[in-house]
Amino acid sequence: MLPTIALIGRPNVGKSTLFNRLLRKKRAITHDMPGITRDRIYAEGNYNGVHYALIDTGGLVMESDNNSEEFQGDIFEQAREAIEEAQALILVVDGRTGITQLDEQVAAYIRQSNKPILLLVNKVDGSELEATATADFHALGFEMMAVSAEHGFNLLELREKVADMALATGIEYEEEDEEAKGLKIAMLGRPNAGKSSMVNALTGEERVIVSDVAGTTRDSVDVTFESGGKIYTFVDTAGVRRRTNITDTIERFSVVRALRSSTKADITVMVVDALAGITKQDKRLLEYLLREAVPFIIAVNKIDLVSKSERNLLREGFERALRMAHHVPVVYTSCISKSGLGGILPLASKLKAECSLRISTGQLNRIMKEIIEKHQPPVVKRRRAKFKYMTQADDEPPTFIFFINDEKLIKSSYHRFLENRLRKILNVKHAPLNIVFRSTFRAKEDIVHK
């Protein structure tokens, strides 16, 4: 278990920038626009061997303000849960603007928690400004410290203070290995396809904000849970739009992280809106996942909104549209009725097992001999490819190298034949399968056919 500290405050006081500086890496999205952090974001910090969990929360707004009304209640609920989870709190305020009524309201609210609170006056760019910037905040009655997350003033002292706060909780850190997170599953798809609803339905809790406004999830949110005696971690990613539709820098950052999450996770679930069908952007996402050899499942969501009489036609349409991803499993789901959701986790586990496949060189060469004897490669320009031997170069995904006299003699149709035969013999139904042909008569870069 980790001692947990939560960053709390009104919008645009620099919580996410402080979060990143304390962690020394860019984990939360930062920008001068209120409401950027909507879900609570977790990460592990470490200073001089003191480990702790840090939670970044959305800016608390007590009254309706312009267009923030849609997220007020949800952000407040996420912050409230973070306060309950944490053993200590850091109230972040803006030293440039001075104390505001909203600061006082937030302070009054978190004081009720009876937890240790550090008042952090941010945006103080030097010691000469410290006395003036902090003067008004003494009235709040908390232990206080002045910093500048942007320019680094007092950051070393802050890291030491946060480590002291973690030690003061009395919670002893127990190191977790990657196995503690279990199977990591990234959720990927266009905005408002239902990714967050699916995470909540599968985990059984309202962990990720759900709204019918596209773009609610702007950052990757990790959710670890147990199901059927197995541990899973969902990474609920921001929706991915066409680049021409990404109108602000915030969403650009989120899209990059969403795509990165899909390649770092064990398995990706690509969520598609049943009503919208396979859009151009969905096809681009498919091409990206196939190109990167990402093991993934396609979840056609909101199937409950399609009439029963039209579902067969819808399935036929999806089958035609997904021919390029013939090996990828497709499930039809509804987060409202829970239809189809029960198959996702077992399918993800099976897909992970397929990706981890390791076959000995001896067994592979017996398989190769059997395949080639039954179906010789076609003659190309009076020459036929001669297979010398094969080996497995990697797993996750399985990658096999065929050593032949000249890789130019392999046609795409024969490559597909070899892939299909290997899938059947090795029982690799859904995982990506990389096949490399390497010429033995001269040194040359590998040519990979996926």
Swiss-Prot record:
Molecular function (Gene Ontology), one example: GTP binding
One GO biological process term is: ribosome biogenesis
Alphabetical list of InterPro entries matching this protein: AAA+_ATPase (IPR003593), G_ENGA (IPR031166), GTP-bd (IPR006073), GTPase_Der (IPR016484), KH_dom-like (IPR032859), KH_dom-like_a/b (IPR015946), P-loop_NTPase (IPR027417), Small_GTP-bd (IPR005225)
Identify the keywords attached in UniProt to this record, alphabetized. Answer: GTP-binding, Nucleotide-binding, Repeat, Ribosome biogenesis
Q: Which residues form the KH-like domain?
A: 357-441
Q: Which Pfam families match?
A: KH_dom-like, MMR_HSR1
Identify the residues that the record assigns to the EngA-type G domain, covering every copy.
3-170, 183-356
The role this protein plays is: GTPase that plays an essential role in the late steps of ribosome biogenesis.
Q: Which family does it belong to?
A: Belongs to the TRAFAC class TrmE-Era-EngA-EngB-Septin-like GTPase superfamily. EngA (Der) GTPase family.
Q: What is this protein called?
A: GTPase Der
